[in-house]
Each structure stands twice: as C-alpha cells, then as structure tokens.
Amino acid sequence: GLYYQSPFYKELRQQQIDEKGNHVTVLNKDIKSQRALHFILGADYTFKAADRNFKLSAELYYKKLDPINPYTVDNVKIRYYGDNCAKGYAMGMDVKFFGEFVPGTDSWISFSLMKSEQTIGETTKAPLPNSPSYNVSLFFQDYFPGYKRVKLNLKGVVAGGLPQTIPGQGYEAGYFRTPAYKRVDIGLSYQLAGGNDAIMDKGLFRHLKNIWIGADVFNLFGIKNVSSYYWITDAYNVQYAVPNYLTGRQFNARLIVDF
C-alpha cells in the first residue's frame, strides 16, 4: 500500500533564529506530504485442541517512510521540525495466540518486535517517536471451579520505553529511552442474572441477556511507569530530567448489561 499524509498547520511551523538572535516561528509553505510505502505479509492458522478453538495470527511488515517531517514530544506537546529533512523506515513482526484455554472463555497472548529509524539530514540517526522496540501482552480468563457465575480475568503488559529528547532541542542533541512500561490488572465478575434464570422472563429483564457486576484492581503491583519528564535547569545551565509518573494502583467497580 501507498499512503500520503497531507500536512496540517503544526507541521508548517518552523523555528528559526533572526539576525538579533531571537527565536521566531515562520510558516514553511514548501512542506510536502509525508509518504509511507507499506509491505505487509500476514497469516492466520485456526485449529482445535482438546475440543477447544484456537487461532494463531502472525504478521510481518516493512514501511518505507519519506519525506519525513520529524517531530519531538515534550509531555503532551508535539513540535515539528517544519521541514521534510528526514527519511526512515519501520519494520517488525506481530504474533498473537488466541483461544479457549479454559472452555467457554476467550484468552490471548501477543508478542511484538519493532525497529524504526529516521535519518535527519544526512548524519543524525534516531528512532521514530512512539515506537517501543518490543511488547508482550496477555489476557486470561477463568471461572471459579464448579461455579461459572464467578469469572476471573488477568491482564498484563510489558513494553519497551519510548525515546525522549531535551525540550527545545532535536534529536541532533541526543536522545534516551524511558524505562520499560509494566502493568498487571486483575478483575472479578459475578453474573447477577442471565441465561435460563427465571427472572429473565419477567418485565424488563425479557429484553436483557446478561447482567454482571465486577471489581478491578488496575496496576495491581503499583508500578511507577514514566509518562514523560519535567526538565529543570540549574544556575550552571545544566538540565535534569525529573520523571512524571502515570497513575498508580486504582480500584474500579463496574456494571455490565448485555442487550
């Protein structure tokens, strides 16, 4: 596939230094659409084991990117170079194993590898923003032994860190990656009504399929994942990166009604 992304206003903004040494912003009217040439190969394999359904999916991809208008990310602020001064690529693989590890429930595990690189100018090489080098995720469900009204689910993810740069400077000044992202969630659900329950034939319940209540613990182990950095400059003009952390452990209650 061939994809073109038309530039929008932020991509036209270019930082320059005037004759007085001041930083000014001008609009680069010569910006071109960024282009991506995709090569993707995928396959699915469906099979049965122990009278249960399973599916294995795999995908390989290579994406040639040019001309790139590079950008840096500072917390939630995105700043483009304002120039088509780079070219690059992204390539990798995704594998997902999906199936009924426990009869009547859906669970999966996935694994991804990715390598991305952009060459800015002719010499500076750096990864693309928002590009972790790996990701491992799983989602597992099980019933309480002998009582299918109680369901347990477990979610987990481990992903590589994202590239970071010094605010106000591009990749030419260097970059580093945040620590790996790690998180585990656990949840418990109870079916209040559904299926062949007598109440499902009465009143408004006739229009419903299932009613579940549940409780979750997000970020079960209270892991401090870094979302971005707050930069501090001391009296000697040395900058220090102070991490900003994502939300820690949280508790959640839910009600699910299936129509």
For each feature predicted by the language model, list its residue ranges:
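Membrane-embedded beta-barrel scaffold of Gram-negative outer-membrane proteins
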Residues: 1, 5, 30-84, 89, ...
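Outer-membrane beta-barrel translocator domains and adjoining extracellular loop/strand segments
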Residues: 9-16, 22-23, 68-76, 114, ...
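Gram-negative outer-membrane beta-barrel transporters
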Residues: 55, 59-64, 81-166
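C-terminal beta-signal and adjacent terminal beta-strands/loops
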Residues: 5, 107, 157-167, 190-259
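Outer-membrane beta-barrel strand-turn architecture
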Residues: 35, 47-50, 64, 99-105, ...
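Transmembrane beta-strands of outer-membrane beta-barrel pores
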Residues: 2-6, 15-16, 45-47, 60-67, ...
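Residues that define the transmembrane beta-barrel architecture of outer-membrane proteins
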Residues: 35-39, 62, 87-91, 130-136, ...
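Residues on the lipid-exposed face of transmembrane beta-strands in outer-membrane beta-barrel proteins
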Residues: 2, 31, 41-45, 93-99, ...
